[in-house]
Amino acid sequence: MHMRLVVIAIGRLKQGPERQLAERYRERFDDIGRKLGFRGLDIHEIPESRARDAATRMAEEAAAIAAAIPDNSMLVCLDERGHNIDSATFAGHIGRWRDEGVAATAFVIGGADGLSPELRRKAKLGVAFGAATWPHQIVRVLLLEQIYRTATILAGHPYHRA
């Protein structure tokens, strides 16, 4: 069985260096991932809510995110309250889920107001990229790099030299 990886992100990456870098890591992953039992890396961009208050924005975005999560997925939330884990541990989770026959892993990146508490509770794993707060565009690039790095770790490729 092949595991599908899905990135669900609030907001759109406009043309420019962030989008180019994100695409580069996605393409690199695709080159290695298929050989490792991954069925591709899909990216779903969800428009930011235009609601006036943060609670409504977060609720609207959470509903759109929930609708985009594939059935029977492992849910990973990128969240400043998440765990700071190293790349090998991150790769270990994804590799183990693949080996256990999980159909999909969905990585969720919230908008400016973050992720709803309900989504965070449903997550199998919450991940933070350090203690700093990052713009969601940068988080997407960091996530795609870590997904590519995961593939290289699982393949024994020399990209990861830690």
Swiss-Prot record:
Enzyme class: transferase
Gene3D superfamilies: 3.40.1280.10
Catalytic activity: pseudouridine(1915) in 23S rRNA + S-adenosyl-L-methionine = N(3)-methylpseudouridine(1915) in 23S rRNA + S-adenosyl-L-homocysteine + H(+)
Single GO cellular component term: cytoplasm
Residues binding S-adenosyl-L-methionine, per UniProt: 78, 110
Protein's cellular compartments: Cytoplasm
Keywords: Cytoplasm, Methyltransferase, rRNA processing, S-adenosyl-L-methionine, Transferase
Record-level Gene Ontology MF annotations: rRNA (pseudouridine-N3-)-methyltransferase activity
EC assignment: 2.1.1.177
UniProt similarity note: Belongs to the RNA methyltransferase RlmH family.
Subunit structure: Homodimer.
Function description: Specifically methylates the pseudouridine at position 1915 (m3Psi1915) in 23S rRNA.
HAMAP family named in the record: 23SrRNA_methyltr_H (MF_00658)
Protein name stated in the entry: Ribosomal RNA large subunit methyltransferase H
Gene that this polypeptide is encoded by: rlmH
